[in-house]
């Protein structure tokens, strides 16, 4: 089982869409057994797959020791995906209940994922766009980090703080940066090379070749609670996410 944490330090980087479509492509086109984890209290991944976050338990009850992880896994209709939804309790989980007094609480996720390691080929975690307890826990549990950004100044500059955060964790726990995925890409952007250079300085050699172009069909698919592969299979977003998944699989094979 390979565990991938999908990260950003700024909202609006298509982090959740990347998580969803990487998982969907692995399941649909590569017959992989995939578990998606919504670890962001905003619960956009949960909503984007057609579930109401107010109706389901999140990993919060598992990390608090109230339920087993198998009890909170939900199969997603018409896909080969399983999901652990998010809820608002995740926002304050580390200062609640059993976790509040546990100095090693950020290592619990890694422990609980061990019980499903034979059930899935990939676990993909959608983390909050901040350097918080949830993000740290996800990175400690992960084998790989996939970083999301947009070709905008503040998004790219935020990578510097994220890089330091990841470096601190990887010094204590094995973690490989899989790559930096750029979304909302404009092939004719005047500053494309400048943004690429900034990313290269922060994460040398990690900028992925596949860029995700802006495409309204992704938002339209979310309204229906489905991946864009299901609603607009010929859209450029479908092509881009399919190619991104292929590129990442090659990297995973070679690492």
Curated annotation (Swiss-Prot):
Q: What PANTHER family does this protein's entry cite?
A: P-LOOP CONTAINING NUCLEOSIDE TRIPHOSPHATE HYDROLASE, PARA FAMILY PROTEIN CT_582
CDD domains per the record? ParAB_family
Superkingdom: Bacteria
The record's section on SUPFAM superfamilies has: P-loop containing nucleoside triphosphate hydrolases
InterPro entries in UniProt: AAA_dom, DNA_Partitioning_ATPase, P-loop_NTPase
Coiled-coil region: none
UniProt record similarity statement: Belongs to the ParA family.
Q: Which Pfam families match?
A: AAA_31 (PF13614)
Q: What is the protein name stated in its UniProt record?
A: ParA family protein CPn_0805/CP_1066/CPj0805/CpB0834
């Amino acid at each position: 089982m390979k565990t991938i944490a999908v990260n950003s330090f700024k909202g609006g980087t298509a982090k959740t869409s990347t998580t969803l479509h990487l998982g969907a492509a692995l399941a649909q086109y590569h017959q992989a057994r995939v578990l998606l984890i919504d670890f962001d209290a905003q619960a956009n991944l949960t909503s984007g797959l057609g579930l109401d976050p107010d109706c389901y338990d999140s990993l919060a009850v598992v990390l608090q020791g109230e339920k087993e992880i198998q009890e909170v896994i939900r199969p997603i209709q018409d896909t080969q995906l399983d999901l652990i939804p998010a809820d608002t309790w995740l926002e304050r989980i580390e200062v609640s209940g059993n976790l509040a007094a546990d100095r090693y609480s950020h290592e619990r996720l890694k422990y609980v994922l061990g019980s499903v390691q034979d059930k899935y080929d990939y676990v993909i975690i959608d983390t909050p766009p901040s350097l918080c307890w949830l993000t740290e826990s996800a990175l400690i549990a992960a084998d790989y980090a996939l970083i999301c950004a947009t070709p905008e100044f503040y998004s790219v500059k935020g990578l510097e703080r994220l890089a330091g955060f990841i470096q601190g964790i990887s010094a204590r726990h094995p973690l490989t940066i899989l790559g930096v995925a750029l979304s909302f890409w404009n092939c004719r952007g005047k500053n494309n090379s400048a943004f690429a250079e900034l990313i290269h300085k922060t994460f040398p050699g990690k900028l992925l070749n596949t860029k995700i172009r802006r495409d309204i069909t992704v938002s339209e698919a979310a309204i229906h609670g489905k991946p864009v592969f299901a609603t607009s299979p010929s859209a450029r977003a479908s092509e881009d996410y399919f190619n991104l998944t292929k590129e990442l699989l090659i990297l995973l094979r070679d690492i």
